[in-house]
Curated annotation (Swiss-Prot):
GO terms for molecular function: 2-dehydro-3-deoxyglucarate aldolase activity; magnesium ion binding. NCBIfam families: GarL, PRK10558.1. Homohexamer; trimer of dimers. Catalyzes the reversible retro-aldol cleavage of both 5-keto-4-deoxy-D-glucarate and 2-keto-3-deoxy-D-glucarate to pyruvate and tartronic semialdehyde. GO terms for biological process: D-glucarate catabolic process; galactarate catabolic process. Its EC number is 4.1.2.20. The keyword Aminoacyl-tRNA synthetase does not apply. Substrate binds at residues 151, 178-179. The record marks 89 as: Increases basicity of active site His. It comes from the Bacteria. The active site is at residue 50. This is 5-keto-4-deoxy-D-glucarate aldolase.
């Protein structure tokens, strides 16, 4: 049986430096995720760090995206091999790893997604991703079809951006603007010049190592500026933000 995740088109698009416009999925609901999957985004982040998601909520969302052209990307709650292994087994193959500060942490993230001898991923012969054992070449194809995006959101991460970006197996560098702003002493103000300078520096250093860079930018002017700075995978909003804004606008139209 063929596995429709191979080849990984999102990974290939990143490697080719093709602009990929994405959206955040934070409502943890398969219907809202299915609607996002119909909108035409290149990729969607299913958030396991700041949204109320777990294995039981991720599976129906992956099912809802089965016919979508939007690539599902999971942001794991933490860079931990067992968590990553379980997410691999339920159907994810694109990973966003939060709060990576060193080359060693980047290497651990990569190793967690690779079968031995390249990594430490535990082996199950039957799970959702290999269609419960019916994909004959899954083991041969898996390692080279996993996407690892590491998130830089601290001063230490900025200081080590060159080593992180140069790590074999890291496919892209993602900036966490809110946590980065907090780490630089500007909590709640990612627009501060110091934060913007750090973001542009991260983009530049990622590019110097041949790696694409990305960011979450729900404000259009910010998203367009980051694209001009060279970011290629940009999430331009979230389901939660769009829902809140639209419902507030609708209520205001009739209540004011």
């Amino acid at each position: 049986m063929n596995n429709d995740v191979f080849p990984n088109k999102f990974k290939a698009a990143l490697a080719a430096k093709q602009v990929q416009i994405g959206c955040w999925s934070a409502l943890s609901n398969p219907i809202s995720t299915e609607v996002l999957g119909l909108a035409g985004f290149d990729w969607l982040v299913l958030d396991g760090e700041h949204a109320p998601n777990d294995i039981s909520t991720f599976i129906p969302q992956l099912m809802a995206l089965k016919g979508s052209a939007s690539a599902p990307v999971v942001r794991v709650p933490t860079n931990e091999p067992v968590i990553i292994k379980r997410l691999l087994d339920i159907g994810f193959y694109n990973f966003l790893i939060p709060f990576v500060e060193t080359k060693e942490e980047a290497e651990q993230a990569v190793a967690s997604t690779r079968y031995p001898p390249e990594g430490i991923r535990g082996v199950s012969v039957s799970h959702r991703t290999n269609m419960f054992g019916t994909v004959a070449d899954y083991f041969a194809q898996s390692n080279k079809n996993i996407t690892i995006l590491v998130q830089i959101e601290s001063q230490q991460g900025v200081d080590n951006v060159d080593a992180i970006a140069a790590t074999e197996g890291v496919d892209g560098i993602f900036v966490g603007p809110s946590d980065l702003a907090a780490a630089l002493g500007h909590l709640g103000n990612a627009s501060h010049p110091d934060v913007q300078k750090a973001i542009q520096h991260i983009f530049n250093r990622a590019s110097a190592h041949g790696k694409p860079s990305g960011i979450l930018a729900p404000v259009e002017a910010d998203a367009r500026r980051y694209l001009e700075w060279g970011a290629t995978f940009v999430a331009v909003g979230s389901d939660l933000g769009v829902f809140r804004s639209a419902t507030q606008k609708l209520a205001d139209t009739f209540k004011k």
